[in-house]
Amino acid sequence: MARMKARSAKGKRVAKDTWKSKVWYNIYTPQSFGGDVIGQTPANDPSALMGRISEISLRDLTNEHSKHMTRMYFKVDGVSGNNAITQFVGHDTTREYLKSQIRRRRSKINVIIDVRTKDGFKVRVKALVLTAVRARDYHKTEIRVKMEQIIKEMANETAFAEFVHAMVMGGVGSKIYSECKKMFPLKRVEIFKSEVLEFGKAVLEVTPEAQEAVEGEEKQ
């Protein structure tokens, strides 16, 4: 019995610790979002990083506390040395925040529209208008048509990075508010979600910080 136990212990395979072989990579936002490090991620091989999505709040990205409810998503689409370069792929707004904005005796008008930017990016945009008082159906229809028109025009007239900035920082919402309040009293406008459906004329953005890090590694 003792011999059998000894043989069993001797023949047992030792599991390889793959975690120790992983390399940590810095995750950078695109240059249009500051080119900052937003986190780190491990991988056995650089190719394993491609397509990984990182999330960060817009508050942490811009240092604006009022943007705490917005989450930004960036996908790795290139690796330079130990640095992962990303592309913006969408944003959303927390459910808790959206629910807190809805009140009784107000109307909620939703719009979902696919638009294309000047440089060929196709983006799905979800917008919300809250009226100050309850609106009739024909008012809702008029506002919805105007919302779609404004979002489409702003996308068609601007490059992708500029349009994304206008979506998440309030430019698109402000334009909708100023135009639609002429039609009916409004309380709030939110561009609460976006998703990049097709990428256009994108150039891989190696940030200055990432380039410096790579050059430093090459000198060592």
Swiss-Prot record:
Pfam families, alphabetized: Ribosomal_S3Ae
UniProt GO cellular component terms: ribonucleoprotein complex; ribosome
KW Glycoprotein (keyword) present: no
Domain of life: Archaea
GO biological process, one term: translation
Keywords for this protein: Ribonucleoprotein, Ribosomal protein
Similarity-based family: Belongs to the eukaryotic ribosomal protein eS1 family.
Species this protein is from: Methanococcus vannielii (strain ATCC 35089 / DSM 1224 / JCM 13029 / OCM 148 / SB)
Name of the featured protein: Small ribosomal subunit protein eS1
HAMAP family assigned: Ribosomal_eS1
Gene Ontology MF: a single term: structural constituent of ribosome
Lineage, broadest ranks: Archaea, Methanobacteriati, Methanobacteriota, Methanomada group, Methanococci
